[in-house]
């Protein structure tokens, strides 16, 4: 994995998908850009903001932002990697619901997944 694409000093942009929160959307799982810290939603989520961020910025490396997960993914090679410790926090708050955010998830949320 190219280390120059990883900035271990940049904190996450927040505790939820930046774009979903701006548009009153919702997500299933969260991903963290390891270049700029942007938090986006996974490809199973309705809006797939993490991969859209990678495509629009060229920031191809992400890390899971889920509790108990520390894997990295490269959108260019479509491979998992191990990577360095990033600036805290390592995951969204433990009391944050999945899917989230609270109050935005429709009752039939499973039907909207990819």
Where does each model-flagged region fall?
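Canonical RING-type zinc finger of E3 ubiquitin-protein ligases
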Residues: 25-34
């Amino acid at each position: 994995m190219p280390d120059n694409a990883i900035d271990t000093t940049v904190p996450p942009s927040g505790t939820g998908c930046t774009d979903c929160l701006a548009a009153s959307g919702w997500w299933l799982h969260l991903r963290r850009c390891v270049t700029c810290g942007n938090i986006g939603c996974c490809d199973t989520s309705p809006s797939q903001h993490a991969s859209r961020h990678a495509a629009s910025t060229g920031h191809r490396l992400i890390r899971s932002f889920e509790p108990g997960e520390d894997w990295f993914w490269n959108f260019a090679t479509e491979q998992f990697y191990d990577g360095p410790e990033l600036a805290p926090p390592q995951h969204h708050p433990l009391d944050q619901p999945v899917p989230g955010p609270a109050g935005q998830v429709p009752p039939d949320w499973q039907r909207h997944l990819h």
